[in-house]
A protein has these predicted regions:
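Active-site-proximal loop and beta-strand segments within enzyme catalytic domains
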Residues: 73, 94-214
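Structural recognition of the beta-strand scaffold that forms the well-ordered cores
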Residues: 76-79, 101-103, 109, 148-151, ...
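Secretory-pathway/luminal and periplasmic proteins that interact with or process carbohydrate-rich
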Residues: 86-87, 138-147, 155-162, 232-235, ...
Length: 402
């Protein structure tokens, strides 16, 4: 029952008691004299409790989106502020427990893991040092820093050069070259694949800090460097710095790229957990990603544990991709900076998932999609969420007087 409903019932019950009391007085015996009239009783009900934002129009837009497409059987989203979940809704065949492949919406949690490792006083690791500081081998990319890699400014060719990363047809393992980072086959090992990436220079490589070039090998090298520095697997680091303190249920990294449609929604069906793909291999449910977004809104906390400093959170939002000379794009570390919607940062994925925070309003959200076939227009849900849903969410938030 709503607070308003409780207040109204309470007011009604008070008036009924007063009415019953007046009837008892009227029915009482007595002599011929009359008593002075009692002063009127004035009841002032408490003002109604403030109501939260009304996201019904946002819900309706999600329903309209899913009704208007044959590509997707379900969609869901969750909104948070610094205190917790403020709204969530599922549509179609989605439930609150639906687990999806995140693709590039893995990037923000990956950066969170790296920043938390940097803050760990028991591990020698800095995103500002060349990766060769920590790796037991040299190579053309050993002089690049993790900070440059996770801001897509390392000079290592990104996904634009994917066709020249290697040959998935072999005939030898070496022919895979940089494509080893996208394989869940047990013949590929996480750290040895990282060594392949560092030591095999790609065409059109540039000096660090000159150009923005999204995704690819630079992200994998960053994750491998962290694992070597900490003497731990990547998923051990994710569990140590995010999973355990935040109480995450399913969040983990694998490597589904060779056959994403083989993922059934269960953790057990996720391929490649021993060779996880850093930039795009994570899975999550709504509750887990909601907790990760809260960290960016409450000063770095999961419950009573601070998993990231405010300085690290702020550093992730600083534009690094938009200040280079070539192909400049407003990008922090993991976050795309939405210059057309000030204060909004997003992390969209190839399968259609998107996360966002609005630092001006202190809110954030995550949208889940679970259609991984080639026939699905994964750009449609991303465009819908960023261009339509987020502005509608902001309007509902503002209308509530926040």
């Amino acid at each position: 029952m709503s607070n308003d409903g409780f207040i109204n019932l309470r007011s009604i019950s008070i008036w009924l008691l007063l009415l019953a009391f007046s009837v008892l007085i009227g029915c009482g015996g007595g002599g011929g004299g009359s008593s002075p009239a009692a002063p009127p009783v004035v009841v002032n009900p408490s003002p109604p409790e403030p109501t939260g934002p009304d996201f019904s129009d946002v819900d309706a837009s999600f329903q309209a989106f899913i009704d208007g497409t044959s590509d997707f059987d379900g969609i869901s989203y969750v909104l948070v502020d610094a205190e917790g979940v403020i709204h969530q809704k599922t549509f179609g065949d989605h439930t609150e427990d639906t687990v999806v492949l995140l693709a590039s919406t893995s990037k923000v949690p990956a950066v969170m893991t790296l920043m938390a490792l940097q803050e760990d006083p028991e591990v020698t690791f800095s995103i500002g040092e060349p990766v060769g500081t920590y790796l037991p081998y040299d190579g053309p990319y050993a002089d690049r820093t993790v900070e440059q890699m996770i801001s897509n400014t390392s000079g290592i060719p990104g996904l634009r050069l994917l066709a020249e990363y290697g040959s998935p047809a072999g005939p030898s393992i070496e022919d895979f070259n940089h494509l080893c980072q996208y394989s869940g086959q047990p013949i590929f090992e996480f750290e040895s694949c990282g060594q392949t990436l560092v030591q095999n220079e790609l065409p059109t490589s540039r000096p660090a800090g000159r150009a923005y070039d999204y995704g690819g090998s630079q992200w994998q090298i960053a994750g491998v460097t962290a694992s070597v520095a900490a003497n731990a697997t990547w998923n051990q680091l994710v569990d140590r710095y995010l999973g355990t303190p935040c109480g995450l249920e399913v969040f983990t990294f694998g490597n589904p790229w060779e056959s994403p449609t083989s993922f059934t929604g269960s953790v057990e069906s996720l391929a490649g957990t021993t060779n996880p793909n850093i930039e795009g291999g994570a899975i999550t449910n709504m509750a887990d990603y909601a907790k990760l977004l809260q960290v960016h809104l409450n000063g770095g906390f999961c419950e009573d544990t601070q998993v990231l400093s405010e300085a690290s959170i702020a550093s992730m939002q600083v534009d690094r991709g938009g200040v280079v000379a070539t192909n400049a794009k407003p990008y922090g570390m993991g976050w795309w900076i939405q210059t057309s919607n000030p204060g909004v940062l997003t992390d969209p994925g190839a399968f259609g998932a998107v996360s966002f925070i609005d630092v001006n309003r202190g809110i954030g959200g995550y949208m889940a999609i679970d259609e991984y076939g080639d026939q699905a227009d994964s750009g449609a849900p991303r465009a819908f969420f960023i261009d339509q849903a987020i502005p509608a969410i902001q309007s509902a938030w503002d209308a509530a007087g926040n």
